[in-house]
């Protein structure tokens, strides 16, 4: 499994021969990549805020997954034609990837001249094998937390039952959890690798990622914190 961080919460996740793009937003200071330079098989949307769906229209010909509220919105507003609406707890098989939708603790607004509630925001657990309690345990699994605060589902459900190896967690504070809460999330999830995201995009979420690393260490977590540069790709098997 390969991960590319395009800044903010925008990630390409490559599972086998399948490329997924989470939350396309390329107008951020971390990336020099244009949407037209990115070819993927599927787009995953965590919620409808502009800094997560701004460039979904650039992928209008690409199959797009999200909650029914968000997929319906982007179909109407941006011309995305092929969508799958799903809901919390569901898993879809997308090529070589298995994608499970999980809860995020945030708000979700959809803009149509005025902003209205867009339903529940989500995160995704992405794996190269279907989630099961009877498998051989050899799956590689990545958790994209979406925009969220610290929430007990990380400790009670996502960590023990979906068992991610690595997690991308927002650390920018103000709109999401900051370094301290994000570090507790990493500890609860019991991941081997943690990637900070959703920071240094605009002034309210400017943070020092070294604070996140210190907070992770303070929890006693054994997770390695990997602070990626924008447009950097990492092979997760090398990081684990």
Curated annotation (Swiss-Prot):
<protein>
    <recommendedName>
        <fullName>UPF0173 metal-dependent hydrolase VNG_1038C</fullName>
    </recommendedName>
</protein>
<comment type="similarity">
    <text>Belongs to the UPF0173 family.</text>
</comment>
<keyword id="KW-0378">Hydrolase</keyword>
<dbReference type="InterPro" id="IPR050114">
    <property type="entry name" value="UPF0173_UPF0282_UlaG_hydrolase"/>
</dbReference>
<dbReference type="InterPro" id="IPR036866">
    <property type="entry name" value="RibonucZ/Hydroxyglut_hydro"/>
</dbReference>
<dbReference type="InterPro" id="IPR022877">
    <property type="entry name" value="UPF0173"/>
</dbReference>
<dbReference type="InterPro" id="IPR001279">
    <property type="entry name" value="Metallo-B-lactamas"/>
</dbReference>
<dbReference type="GO" id="GO:0016787">
    <property type="term" value="F:hydrolase activity"/>
</dbReference>
<dbReference type="Pfam" id="PF13483">
    <property type="entry name" value="Lactamase_B_3"/>
</dbReference>
